[in-house]
Structures are given as C-alpha cells and as structure tokens.
Regions:
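C-terminal motif of bacterial Sec signal peptides marking the signal peptidase cleavage site
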Residues: 17-20
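Bacterial signal peptide processing site
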Residues: 22-24
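Sec-dependent N-terminal signal peptides
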Residues: 6-12
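Positively charged n-region of N-terminal signal peptides that target proteins for export
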Residues: 1-4
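Conserved functional acidic sites
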Residues: 27-181
Length: 181
C-alpha cells in the first residue's frame, strides 16, 4: 500500500512541475529556410509577420524570464510598398514602448533588374533604470510561417515573428528573453 501512495505522490509532484513550466518560443536550432525570390513575396511576408498584427495605441504583453509581465503600447506600426521603372521596395516597421523599454523593428526589401536585397534593423533599449541595450542589423531567415532575425556576429536569435501573430520571442544582448503572452 505504501508503494502505491508513494507512486501517486510522486506522480502528483511531477505533474505540478510540468504544469508550472512555461513554454518558451526561443529557437533551439536553425530553421529550414524558405526561398523568397521577389520583393513582393518578401514584403508580404514582412507585413503578415509584423505590422498587420498591431494597431497604433493597442497594448501587447510580454513575459521576461526574470520579471513579471510587461505591457507595451504600440507607438507606430506601418507598411509601405513602392514600385516604379523596374525597381521596387517594401518596408514594414513596428515601434513599441513600455515604462522600461523601447523596441524598434524594421524589415525592408528592395531591388530591380533581376536583383533583390532584404535587410532588418532591431533596437531593444532600456528607457529608465534598465541598462541593457541591443541594436544591430540582423540576418533574416524565412521559414514557412515565421521570420527569424539572427545576429550574424554572435549567432544568437534576437527576434522571432510569426505570420498572423507578430512577435513571439525577443532577446536582448544582456541575455534577457521575452515571450509573447
């Protein structure tokens, strides 16, 4: 009888531990890249992963691994596409702020005459007593439904965006990880 009680008690402890573990959207390996060859495809991907999911004035909440939840207000969110005389460019951007942080993400693609180029800029800056800052032009990796922004210098993923959702994961250069709620 004691064995059964002990086994039930152990199972209860394990199930509580599993319930209390929060899932992380932190990338654990490199995604399988999806080849996007036109500016229009890149722009559509940027828009559906970033600006379409946010309206100016709305509140978005993130959980930092060492803190309670943090609410951000969308300050700016927009996308633009321009095409003329064989050249085109697409741009999508998001600026969000909390009491402690300002986060700016920009994605852009441009090209013409058979050549395409895409790039990104991300800045995660503390606005009060926080000192961690992150600013770089990361590598963009497209997968089927996500965009991964990877710092080529460090190899770390700074941000992951998901189509129809927006930001699901961020990391600053102090190693703080943020997960969307």
């Amino acid at each position: 009888m004691k064995k059964y009680v002990s086994a039930i008690f152990t199972m209860a402890i394990l199930s509580l531990a599993l319930v209390s573990c929060e899932p992380s959207n932190k990338p654990t390996k490199d995604p399988v890249p999806e080849q996007l060859t036109t500016i229009n495809d890149m722009y559509d991907s940027f828009k559906s992963c970033l600006s379409l999911n946010y309206a100016e004035g709305m509140t978005v909440t993130f959980k930092r691994e060492d803190r309670s939840n943090e609410d951000f207000t969308v300050i700016e969110s927009f996308s633009e596409y321009d095409s003329e005389e064989g050249e085109s460019a697409g741009f999508s951007a998001l600026l969000i702020e909390s009491n402690n942080w300002e986060i700016d993400i920009e994605l852009y693609a441009e090209g013409g005459y058979g050549e395409t180029y895409e790039g990104a800029y991300i800045s995660i800056v503390g606005t009060s007593s926080e000192t961690a800052e992150y600013e770089c032009e990361p590598l963009i990796i497209h997968s089927k439904d996500k965009i991964y922004l990877k710092d080529e210098a460090t190899g770390q993923y700074i941000c992951v965006l998901q189509k129809g959702v927006g930001i699901i994961y961020m990391e600053d250069n102090a190693g703080h990880t943020w997960n969307a709620l």
